[in-house]
Amino acid sequence: MTNLEELWVGKNKITSLQGIAPLTKLRVLSIQSNRLTKLEGLETLTALEELYLSHNGIKKLENLEHNTQLTTLDFCANQVTTIEHVRHLSRLSQFWANDNLIADLNHLDAHLGPQYMPHLDTVYLEGNPGQKSEGANYRRKVQLALPQIAQLDATLVRRS
């Protein structure tokens, strides 16, 4: 099992990532639609490239310091309130954060800007309170903060 490269355990009522530490060769981890409330136990998974955490009860993005190979981070439909602790994920190309509780979109560049994430291509933020409160300004605001992206939510970004 220690040579396992992909683990897909969706819809299993998982409440913690206990026991996953020996799987150091994991590249893809999908734990969607479970009962996680906290991100922990990923420290030894330094080869991880794709992490799918959607539809859990995660409240905070944290404990990803050792997962610097991540190219995809999906934490849609959780209870995350702020985008933080991701600046070091410089290889990230896909950042899916839609349908959370993120109210403030004013500092996206401080966490996801091109100086930190030059490969960031796709960002999903729709369905957050911040998107709703920005109204018609939402798309433009995100594009100005993240000029490197080619897709915002399900729509391609026009380059001016």
Listing of model-derived features with the role each one plays in the protein:
Residues 122, 127-160:
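Membrane-proximal C-terminal cap and juxtamembrane stalk of leucine-rich repeat ectodomains
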Residues 52, 85, 95, 101, ...:
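Alpha-helical recognition domains of nuclear gene-regulatory proteins
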Residues 68-82:
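Short, charge-rich amphipathic segments
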Residues 14-15, 36-37, 58-59, 80-81, ...:
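Extracellular beta-strand scaffolds
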Residues 1, 17-24, 40-46, 61-68, ...:
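A structural signal for leucine-rich repeat
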